[in-house]
Amino acid sequence: MAKKHVSDLDLKGKVVLERADFNVPLKDGKITNDNRIVQALPTIEYILDQGGRLVLFSHLGKVKEESDKEKLTLRPVAERLSEKLGKDVNFIPHTRGEVLEKAIAELKDGEVLLVENTRFEDLDGKKESKNDPELGKYWASLGDVFVNDAFGTAHRSHASNVGIASNLESAAGDLMEKEIKFIGGVVNNPDKPVVAILGGAKVSDKIGVIENLLNVADKVLIGGGMAYTFLKAQGYEIGKSLLEADKVDFAKDLLERAGDKIVLPVDAKVAREFSNEAQFTVVTIDQIPADQEALDIGPKTVELFEKELKGAHTVVWNGPMGVFEFENFAQGTVGVCEAIAEMKDATTIIGGGDSAAAAMMLGFEDDFSHISTGGGASLEYLEGKELPGIQSISDK
């Protein structure tokens, strides 16, 4: 069922509650990457241009004890957002109560305020994270309509997304709608042929994704640390490479079911120690020395993956091909990233997390159709799960 979009709502003079995702990295109280704030701007600017009176909600980090409050306040976000918008953002250092209610009542058309970190409510019985019905109802009572633009928390059922949406007419923001279109599109109605590239360290993190994408994709290319559990299942000796011994039988079963759909590395960069400075060699998969571990896919694998990508209409990539934080072991990830970035006629999607970080680090963010803002949310969406944050948005 299609979900309402913010443009379907009448916003002029209305108090618009919006759940944004301002969960940005901080160091010594300073924001080190404001990408999430930048990506939230189109919806915020649209609401303000339409004459909405905007009340923004977001979480920041995990709030476990009273002392976390000082370092996890949203005040730095309010300051950065104000810079980006070129207008005042009234920061309210409360999540409920008279000060907040008065500030909302005094909002004029086109003005914006930011409520303090929603997870401050977790100090008293996890009210935000457990979607306390009274809290959801209270927050909903502060506004006329609700806009959810926080895909990063769409897989969570919290008071500030599902709780508010259950009590108010609600719609998706631009960012949320883009995620539904691209990530949801891969799962529900992709333009074929579809090639999925999966990497990262653990098979266990991606079991649901692999299972679901095998139903959708024409090919699933597997790299990263997780590939070695599959290679072990094929009978290869993998030396000291990453292995999830309890997942070998699962990998074996999957390989049998998938036939030639799954494509594994044919060579690897191996080293004796886990370090960027480690001496490395490139070996074929059947030649990994017993005392060494694979830290990246090799050049022949990059070539093979490039060949498998040719002709694909939809490509979804989730997870790096090696230890891309080490420059000497980043070539596999760089090679795959470049190959996908050059596919101008295909729909190319990065499913969040480390691959998104890699693409941005390499300067390729503008070369993909879509880079997801969700980590866990993208994975659960790719698994084919219903996400409560999306489900709770009003249908058209």
UniProtKB/Swiss-Prot annotation:
One of its GO terms (biological process) is glycolytic process. Pathway: Carbohydrate degradation; glycolysis; pyruvate from D-glyceraldehyde 3-phosphate: step 2/5. It is an enzyme of class 2 (transferase). CDD domains: Phosphoglycerate_kinase (cd00318). Gene3D superfamilies: Phosphoglycerate kinase, N-terminal domain (3.40.50.1260). Keywords: ATP-binding, Cytoplasm, Glycolysis, Kinase, Nucleotide-binding, Transferase. It is found in: Cytoplasm. GO terms for molecular function: ADP binding; ATP binding; phosphoglycerate kinase activity. InterPro entries: Phosphoglycerate_kinase, Phosphoglycerate_kinase_N, Phosphoglycerate_kinase_sf. Substrate binds at D21, F22, N23, R36, H59, L60, G61, K62, R119, R156. Pfam families: PGK. The keyword Ribosomal protein does not apply. GO terms for cellular component: cytosol. ATP binds at K206, E325, G352, G353, D354, S355. Its EC number is 2.7.2.3. The keyword Cytoplasm applies. It catalyses: (2R)-3-phosphoglycerate + ATP = (2R)-3-phospho-glyceroyl phosphate + ADP. Monomer. Belongs to the phosphoglycerate kinase family. This is Phosphoglycerate kinase. It comes from Staphylococcus carnosus (strain TM300). The lineage of its organism: Bacteria, Bacillati, Bacillota, Bacilli, Bacillales.
